[in-house]
Structure formats: C-alpha cells, structure tokens
Regions:
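C-terminal alpha-helix/helix-terminus motif
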Residues: 10, 46, 328-332
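Short, amphipathic alpha-helical interaction segments positioned at domain boundaries
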Residues: 320-335
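Auxiliary N-terminal substrate/complex-recognition segments of SAM-dependent methyltransferases
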Residues: 4, 33, 296-297, 323
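A short, conserved structural fragment
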Residues: 303-313
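Minor-groove-contacting beta-hairpin "wing" of winged helix-turn-helix DNA-binding domains
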Residues: 314-318
Length: 335
C-alpha cells in the first residue's frame, strides 16, 4: 500500500479512521515489513482514533514474533481462520494447519499480548454429523475465544470444491442437517455465555466486532487493494480484481476502480440486507417515511408468520426467521 493510493482516493483527509481491518486474502503471509508499512501508511495519511485494528491470520502463520510486532503497531484483535478442529476436514478444504496448530495459535496470540481473538468455523462438510459439529464447538469453547464466526460450507463457482460437487465427487449436506447444525450452534454458544448479535457471529459480553458492526450499521468505509470496495453513503466503488492491473495502475498514479451512484431505493435495500442481520434489526426511524411505510407493509405477512417482530420501532428477525433470513430480507427489498 502506498500513501499515494490513499491520498488519491480521499485527498482531503477529512475522515478519522475508527477501525482498520486487514483481510480479504491471507495478510499473515505478508512479511513483517509489509504489514508494518500498511499500518504506518494508514496512520501517516489519515487522522486515526482507532478503537480496533484487526488482522486475519492462518493458524500456521502465527508466531510470537509476528504477534509482538503487530501488537506494537496497534493491532488489538486477531481473526483466526480455524475453520474446523478435525484434521480430516482441514485436509478436505486444503488448509495447511492441523487442529493442534489451531489451538496452539490461540495460546501464542494470548501469550504475546493480544487478548481479543476471533475464530472462524465452518459446518456442513460432506459426511459431517451432528456429533462431529458438537465436537468442533466443544473444542472451540475449550479455547474460550472472545468471538466466534460460523458459516456453512459454500461451494463457490470456480473453486476446487465446486468442481468436486459438479463431478459428483462430494455430496452437499442437506438443508435439514444444516438447519440442525445452526440450531446446535446457537444453543451451544448461548448456553456458554456468548451473545448471538448477528446471524453468523457470536461474542462474549463486550467483544462485538466493532469494524463489522459499523458495516452493518451503514457506516462509510474505505477499501484499499485489489477487489476492495469503498462506500460513502452516496456512492459505492470497487477496485479491479486483477492484481497485476491494480498494481500497474497504482504505480502510474491512477486508481483502477469503478463506481456507482446509490439511489434511494438501493440505499434502502442496503440497510435491509445489513442491519437486518443484527440482533437489533432495522431501526425504522432511520428510514424516510415512504420507505418506513413500505417496510411495514412488506413485513406484515412475515410478522404474522412469526419470522419478523416489530418492537420499539425496530424490525428484526425472530429465531424462526434466522433460518430463512435471505427470503425474509428479499420480501422487504425494493429492487
């Protein structure tokens, strides 16, 4: 990252940086010098009053030296891509680490002085049973991370997993099993003191992800790097995904990006698909009157069906609604 890129994207330096999230790929594979340069460049260009600086890491990249260096740079939160505590399932998704390394990474991070740790988990692997998933949750709880994000395994087009699915080499987990696993996730973590504050995110009291919460609450953000997105309430922009093209543009003093103007309907839909993911739901008083009325009309059937609830001018998903959140949000959208 170069200071020129930041200055070109936001030349007036009028924003104050509240959170920094270094992710999108695998930033822990960068050298310590590269990580230092990224963080120091942000601090040099923008006024920073950062409450949270997060770096994504793979467990096998974690060392005491790395954690000590990033802590001294101001990093106070690590998001660790554990995915599963099953060595067999880790091999299936071609991860380099094993379960023992994942547990050791959490201990190393804490010993090196960063106490705010989030771990990512996946469920819905081929042939994974409810007992297997419970074992993963139990292993995670033994480590007592401050935050847990959990998602069902996705077969994204263009990936090796998708190719295996298309060639009938694996069978996708059925919806009923995924639903049972999600229910187990909610019940197990809630019983162990974790707050379920967003569809896929759980935390101990006081440890919500500040950066992600800002995104879900329609806060403007700046994105740097190939394929990164930026948003300022009025426009959304995205950098070219091709790394060579992106680097070439930056070295020439240009930004390889496109943008779109956000009209009122699109902004309303954006609020629905982000705020509705949170336990607070959509604050209807944030909406213009015509959109507030539209939301209430559109929500009636799902309120009657027990998928949504209306309380204190907030429209939010019920527990039943969490299982079909995409459908419920689609019912509320304009575009």
């Amino acid at each position: 990252m170069r200071s020129g890129e930041l200055k070109a994207l936001y030349p007036d330096h009028e924003c104050t940086i509240d959170t920094v999230y270094i992710g999108g790929g695998t930033p822990s594979t960068l050298s310590i010098d590269d990580l230092s340069r990224i963080i120091n460049t942000i601090k040099a260009v923008f006024p920073c009053k950062t409450r949270e600086i997060t770096i994504e890491m793979n467990p096998d990249d974690v060392t005491t030296e790395l954690i000590s260096v990033v802590r001294n740079l101001g990093v106070n939160r690590i998001s660790l891509g554990v995915q599963t505590f099953s060595d067999e399932r880790l091999r299936f998704i071609r991860r380099r680490h094993n379960a023992a390394q994942a547990a050791k990474a959490v201990e190393t991070i804490r010993r090196a002085g960063i106490d705010n740790i989030s771990i990512d988990l996946m469920f819905g692997f081929p042939h994974e049973t409810l007992n297997d998933w419970q074992n993963d949750l139990d292993a995670a709880l033994k480590l007592r991370p401050n935050h847990i994000s959990a998602y069902s395994l996705m077969y994204e087009e263009g990936t090796p997993l998708y190719l295996m699915l298309q060639n009938d080499k694996v069978q996708q987990t059925d919806d009923d099993t995924c639903l049972a696993m999600y229910t187990m996730l909610m019940d197990t973590l809630s019983a162990n003191g974790y707050e379920h504050y967003e569809i896929s995110n759980f935390c101990l009291p006081g440890y919500r992800a500040i950066h992600n919460s800002s995104y879900w609450n329609d806060t403007p953000y700046l994105g740097f790097g190939a394929a990164a997105h930026s948003y300022n309430l009025l426009t959304r922009s995205w950098n070219v995904a091709d790394i060579k093209e992106y680097v070439s543009a930056i070295e020439s003093g240009n930004l390889a990006s496109e943008s779109e103007r956000i009209d009122d309907d699109t902004h309303y839909d954006d609020i629905i698909t982000t705020a509705m993911r949170t336990c607070e739901g959509v604050d209807l008083m944030r909406l213009k009157p015509e959109y507030r009325n539209y939301a209430l009309r559109s929500a009636k059937n799902d309120i009657d069906g027990g998928l949504l609830e209306l309380a204190d001018n907030h429209l939010r998903l019920t527990r039943k609604g969490l299982f079909v959140s995409d459908m419920v949000m689609s019912n509320l959208m304009k575009v």
